Amino acid sequence: MRPRFFVVYLIAALVIAVDQWTKQWAASTIPPLIGYTVIPGFFDLVNVRNRGAAFGFLNRSDIEWQFWLFFAAAVTAVLAIIAMTRSAKSNPYLFTGFGLIMGGAIGNLIDRIRFRAVIDFLDFHIGGYHWPAFNVADMGICVGAFFVCLAVYKHK
């Protein structure tokens, strides 16, 4: 296996493992829709199911097509990352980003297949502002996108 694939797959595997472990922990420890306050007025641990995308986008129970949309998006992202990893020049920022995005996409895809929804459990809020609950896979996707942008910026 070429080193670039090893790096991408190793990072993806780590994200998937941490994501699935933390979701299992949250689902078995935190009462659904109740949660625990960790830092009053700022951070709670919750146990919610999100049928939509990251941060609650399209989280509606009255539409079924979003399962297939997000399923197809995750599979397409993984296949695109594999293809781009083959053709990309060596760039640690790019390969780190690819691994994080791939791991996040697969982590959430596992939930979609198992539960038809994604387990979200990290809930941040301050004052009247509330950020939608999210999970480790969502963080992988967002941080991975940052690394890909950084790779593009550094390449110029």
Curated annotation (Swiss-Prot):
Active site: 120, 138
GO cellular component assignments: plasma membrane
EC class (word): hydrolase
GO MF term list: aspartic-type endopeptidase activity
PROSITE patterns named among the record's database cross-references: SPASE_II (PS00855)
Keyword match Cell division: no
Membrane spanning residue stretches: 5-25, 63-83, 90-110, 133-153
Predominant cellular place of this UniProt entry's protein: membrane
Catalytic reaction annotation: Release of signal peptides from bacterial membrane prolipoproteins. Hydrolyzes -Xaa-Yaa-Zaa-|-(S,diacylglyceryl)Cys-, in which Xaa is hydrophobic (preferably Leu), and Yaa (Ala or Ser) and Zaa (Gly or Ala) have small, neutral side chains
Subcellular location, record wording: Cell inner membrane
GO terms for biological process, alphabetical: proteolysis
Pfam assignment, any one: Peptidase_A8
Domain of life: Bacteria
Keywords: Aspartyl protease, Cell inner membrane, Cell membrane, Hydrolase, Membrane, Protease, Transmembrane, Transmembrane helix
Protein family: Belongs to the peptidase A8 family.
NCBIfam families: lspA (TIGR00077)
Official protein name in the record: Lipoprotein signal peptidase
